Amino acid sequence: MTGAPGSRWSGFVNDCLYTRPDVDTSDQSPNREYWAHGDLMHKGAYFDPSFEFMNSPESEWDKPFSGTGYRVIKSHTFAFMLDRLKEHGHDMYLIHRPDDECYEWWHTAGGWDITYPDYRRYYWDNDGMKDQIRLQNKHILDFVKQEGLEGYDDGKRTIYRWRPPTNTRKNLTETG
């Protein structure tokens, strides 16, 4: 799962993936939640440089989980490694919103006051955040074009799904 900060990917995950009975939600705990305006905005582990877990598939994906089923691995910076991630054979969701909408929503959701995950050490300041949103969105859209993916606009964001060939499919982030 990838999307730039402010892409509203957490809402998609909460509404469409965490509600499935076959999804492992054992990564969720009170210290991995962020609430704003009375709404639960973030829950579960996030994988990115300077976050609690790094985005390295080889060593980090299993760390926050103890259950079974499909695992939702969320990383903003997966946008930079989509071709490499294809080789793992898992379904991937890519969430996109225009750069300015991402930036505005991220600030509306709490911006630098977001307590989980902590964006300050990787994105640094507003200019750094704008640059990263632009770069992450560019990489996502380049991959979408390269793979010929069609998106679904749910009124909040555009959702793309990449699926590996059926003989290599592991779906979401199934272990094993």
Task: Locate predicted features.
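PAPS-dependent sulfotransferase catalytic core
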Residues: M1-F65, G176
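PAPS-dependent sulfotransferase catalytic domain
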Residues: V72-T175
